[in-house]
Amino acid sequence: MASSILPPEGEALATGWEPDLAPADSLVRQAVLAHASWATDAARRAGKPWYDGDSWAGSVLGDSGPMTNWVIQKQPVDPAEVILDAARQLPNNVPYLFVSPWPTRDLREHGLALAGHPPLMVHLPTTEIVPPATDIDIRQVTDAAGLAEAERVLIEGYPLPELQPFRSGCMYDASFLEGSTVWVGYDGDVPLATSTAHSAAGVTIVENVAVMPAARGRGAGAAITWAATKHHDQPAVLIASDNGQPVYQRLGYLRLERWTVWVRP
């Protein structure tokens, strides 16, 4: 009886990670491919080094901190092979985040340090909640001045000490808005919160969520995340930090699985 469920001999069986497989094969695949787009889009538009192949994608925007540079696996291959290939394809003297949608072996021998196993979370467009309330004014960024304010909030509010003191252009080139949408939350004219949405592979990546101390406890984090989440009528995904998870869960986000994040210092 067991043989009745076996496919015909020689039939090609999809694993879900073939390069030519449609993104919509699974929600996790969409999330992986969308993060690969996120990892390369800003650098590609800014004329900085980037690479997007079958098994991994990555780029180098700067040399001051790992959050500016991403390498993400697109297939369940040996991560050591990806690290070695990244050293050939990209500048090899900069810090970066190494993101794997799968568990990895110990990569310390390759100069990486384990950052953790954060959950990939998803928000489905059919999820109904009451939009979060805040006294912060949420505005979509449309110009260079607004982008610089978003960048400052991200660096000082997240915070990213390796990019301090703040220098405009470390994270966001002027071309960034051509591929992503950014919001800033203001109290009067003071920028206090920010988020970004990047659409690819049929999902929205919600990234770069940060809130300054003066806006915490005022619903700013939830409201600025909600703006990015609902920007496109499609599923939204994000890699959640420890501090962000409770906020995202209240917005209707669900945990899908844990990913693995290493840092090249």
Language-model-detected regions and their locations in the chain:
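A conserved beta-strand-loop-helix scaffold within acyl/acetyltransferase catalytic domains
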Residues: 162-210
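A short helix-loop-beta-strand connector motif used in the catalytic cores of GNAT acetyltransferases and
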Residues: 43-53, 92-96, 101, 115-118, ...
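A short, well-structured alpha-helix characteristic of acyl/acetyltransferase catalytic modules
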Residues: 144-156
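Acyl-donor-binding surface of acyltransferase catalytic domains
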Residues: 74-142, 238-240, 244, 259-264
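N-terminal charged segments
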Residues: 1-91
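Conserved acetyl-CoA-binding loop-helix of GNAT-fold acetyltransferases
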Residues: 79-86, 208-231, 250
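Conserved acetyl-CoA binding element of GNAT-fold acetyltransferases
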Residues: 66-75, 202-213
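Conserved active-site tyrosine of GNAT-family acetyltransferases
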Residues: 107, 248, 253
